[in-house]
């Protein structure tokens, strides 16, 4: 059955991919599958397979899904389509069936499979834009940057070096500032800013 597929858009390096691993810890019986969409070709989703019928009748072809999708395991998976918006058109078209219909090459994914996509924000100038026909298949959700307090608390629990935590306490407001809050990139050298490269 159809499901809603979220497209998580956030600043570079703020943990979008990590969410798949965190979901894997929460659902330990699920396979975690991270698709590096920007580096995929159409053959990475499905390939033609020739069927030779046992009765000797004419052979025919079908498409077989790539094993990385785990369809053959008949188990639930967590599928992250990472860097989805940078993918090749043919790959994205194939993955739209995964996103909307929960199937690939005519084979249904496990009904409990969790699917989401991640991308950078379109304002970062990295080519991340949702095409008109994709807007019907994805629900964009903007991920906010972490606050310095959240990062310091996390770092303290993980045993980060006190000097690093001190630097974050001093410069954290600049480190974790969203680029669209900065009118001139020269005012804050820490986050990526599209103006700095253009």
Predicted features along the sequence, with ranges:
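C-terminal regulatory/interaction module of P-loop NTP-utilizing enzymes
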Residues: 1-32, 36-79, 84-198
